[in-house]
């Protein structure tokens, strides 16, 4: 991989060097934009957005093919809003990202993009996303805007650097993707839409606290008051188990989705709770945090994909 510090702004293509090509520079540029947008976060959240869309179609008694344009607008809008929020997060955190191993290669740290460029890209993505959501229903656009405000202002600009409650605040914004998806089809928001929201809300603290445990020294160096940094691992474990325990009955409230869903949700939930409780006896806290982190990713993916499958 080329480790050159040469800027890859399109205006600097000529200066890229004799061994570079326009295609190489463009490829790097697109990769950098994907890093700014936090592609992994956007992709995983689009799964939950699609689940919200599909379930709304099912429970409004309409036909999937009638909503193809709405689905495209909703997915594109949600993706852009999330990408915009993540890009703005990169812009705001550019002064501390160099202190953390997992963020030190972001384009805002390496200088591949100027701060002004990143700010403009983030604002443009967010604005376009809200416009696309508005083409579905006003409710979807409002929810997207609220989620964006919570993530960028209340989380990134305020609580992330000031309180251990940052994870809870961020969980509100992280829980809106399925709500956006449902609202794009049905602005009235069925009870099931809110249950999807609460599942996402309760899932996020144990997921991100596991990450915080894994990266505790990096967060400490960056001065970010994550719970493991401020209160230690034991308190963090207790809070993680509380959220996992609360998530189990909420996920089972969707028992009308059928026996297969109910059984799988119960097994997934009990398994995660058992792993959480096992953490109080494991000697290697970091290993346990890794297991919890991986389990959380599998839990979310399996649960939301299953919600769609059982309704085919």
Swiss-Prot record:
GO terms for biological process: heme O biosynthetic process. It is a multi-pass membrane protein. It catalyses: heme b + (2E,6E)-farnesyl diphosphate + H2O = Fe(II)-heme o + diphosphate. GO terms for molecular function: protoheme IX farnesyltransferase activity. GO terms for cellular component: plasma membrane. NCBIfam families: cyoE_ctaB, PRK04375.1-2. This is Protoheme IX farnesyltransferase. It comes from Alkalihalophilus pseudofirmus (strain ATCC BAA-2126 / JCM 17055 / OF4) (Bacillus pseudofirmus). The gene is ctaB.
């Amino acid at each position: 991989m080329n480790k050159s510090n040469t800027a890859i702004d399109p205006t600097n293509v000529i200066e890229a060097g004799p061994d570079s090509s326009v295609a190489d520079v463009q490829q790097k540029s697109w990769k950098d934009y994907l890093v700014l947008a936090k592609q992994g976060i956007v992709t995983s959240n689009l799964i939950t957005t699609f689940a919200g869309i599909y379930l709304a179609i099912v429970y409004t008694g309409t036909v999937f093919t009638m909503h193809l344009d709405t689905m495209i607008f909703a997915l594109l809008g949600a993706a852009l809003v999330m990408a915009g929020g993540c890009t703005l997060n990169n812009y705001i955190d550019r002064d501390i990202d160099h202190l953390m191993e997992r963020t030190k290669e972001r384009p805002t740290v390496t200088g591949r993009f100027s701060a002004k460029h990143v700010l403009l890209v983030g604002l443009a993505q967010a604005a376009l996303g809200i416009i696309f959501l508005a083409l579905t229903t006003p409710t979807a656009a409002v929810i997207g805007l609220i989620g964006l405000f919570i993530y960028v202002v209340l989380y990134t600009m305020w609580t992330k650097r000031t309180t251990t409650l940052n994870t809870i605040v961020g969980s509100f914004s992280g829980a809106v993707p399925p709500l956006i998806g449902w609202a794009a089809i049905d602005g009235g928001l069925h009870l099931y839409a809110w249950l999807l929201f609460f599942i996402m809300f309760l899932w996020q603290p144990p997921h991100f606290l596991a990450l915080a445990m894994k990266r505790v020294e990096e967060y400490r160096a960056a001065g970010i008051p994550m719970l493991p940094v401020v209160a230690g691992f034991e308190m963090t474990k207790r809070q993680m188990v509380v959220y996992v325990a609360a998530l189990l009955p909420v996920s089972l409230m969707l028992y009308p989705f059928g026996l297969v869903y109910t059984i799988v949700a119960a097994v997934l939930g009990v398994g995660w709770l058992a792993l959480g409780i096992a953490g109080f006896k494991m000697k290697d806290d970091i290993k346990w945090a890794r297991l919890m982190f991986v389990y959380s990713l599998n839990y979310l993916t399996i649960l939301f994909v299953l919600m769609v499958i059982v309704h085919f």
